[in-house]
């Protein structure tokens, strides 16, 4: 079985006999019910392949679709002039690159369809080209724009951001003036910018990003997983000595969990899934493929906010449109694929957002922790794995020593301007939020969503042990231990056959590390 990793060309996949998950019934629905539309999906989720599929369809390449669902639906197979704009592969942090890229496309089209006046704006030139095409062919044009937002994302939080936005706004205004010459328009990207920015120059495209009809347009559903990939699932199960059903559960926890609408149809990350099958191994493929620069920039502006974003209900207006505000990172984090919809409250029209799966949870929290604590990401990741091993083996003293050393190694400047009591409490709570959530990737974690000032409590469960922690700021370990008993945190585990240990930890605001700890077997 051949997996098309990195291949975004529909014709190459079909002609090369690579695995193709048939989405053409959704493609047919899209092109027959919509004229101008926009789709937001995370990076490496199949947007470019979708654009390539539409390109082949509108060029009437019927032979490529033999045996696919659309072959039974489409009867006419008309050929349309297709204008494909791909902003991938260009660095838009340098002034002039966006204008040069658009000029490249316009010049090539003018070679085919005829010259247009150079003194008019780029958007008007494109409109003239579309008019010429209609006059010459008698057919309306198809425009496909892949990664429409990359010129803005590349320049996020720089002076060039506004300049690139204005250029795109003027260029995309073409679609309003040239409406009579257009058969179909699709813009894909990661982020939907607010309606007053890029899209304000032309008729609003239909946003299908959260349309339940197109939840599975990109990615792999559970039904598709079992239909197309039974063989590689069996291979993985054999390697890890799992049953096939157990292996499916592992894949679901690691790569599934995306939901793109109120229908809550689960979608697997296709990039990670294909890599796992190709390598016959479970790794963090999507996250390892790179962290977008724009996300790193957002994290620099938002530290303590991150623990407030997950596991909460939101009105869709709070995460659908990005307003280029680094102080409000939720839309960018959601649309980039680091958070996803987990539940839908239809009565109040609210969505619960959280991490989609273990790969993203581990990778995102590690990245945030490295950005906050300042060590390298691999150092955070290695420490977490070592700490989990100690907990799994019941080595509580070694774990507390490792925790003390980790906190002591955090550079002083990473504490920022922690000079007030409020800032110290915030640093204390956020520090342990990150550490506990990372441990929770490997252990079962129960942590209070709302913590009292100056304390954090949680329960970590492994196969053989249950640990009840109370972290106290500028208190004593004995007081923390007493808090565990007073609150009755161990009561649910009275009949548990695992060893239950209460651990009280005191955190010093002066040294910014563990001052003392005490433990008690319950």
Language-model regions, residue ranges each:
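Charge-enriched interaction surfaces
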Residues: 425-428
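Structural motif
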Residues: 142, 465-467, 501
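Metal-dependent nuclease catalytic cores in nucleic-acid-processing enzymes
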Residues: 171-178, 331-339, 431-438, 484-503
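Conserved catalytic cores of phosphodiester-cleaving nucleases, focusing on short active-site segments
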Residues: 432, 456-473, 487
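Domain-level recognition of nuclease-like catalytic cores that cleave nucleotide substrates
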Residues: 492, 498-522
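Mg2+/Mn2+-dependent nuclease catalytic core
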Residues: 162-168, 473-490
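Phosphate-binding site recognition
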Residues: 1-423, 439-442
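Active-site metal-binding core of divalent-cation-utilizing nuclease and nuclease-like domains
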Residues: 133-137, 439-463
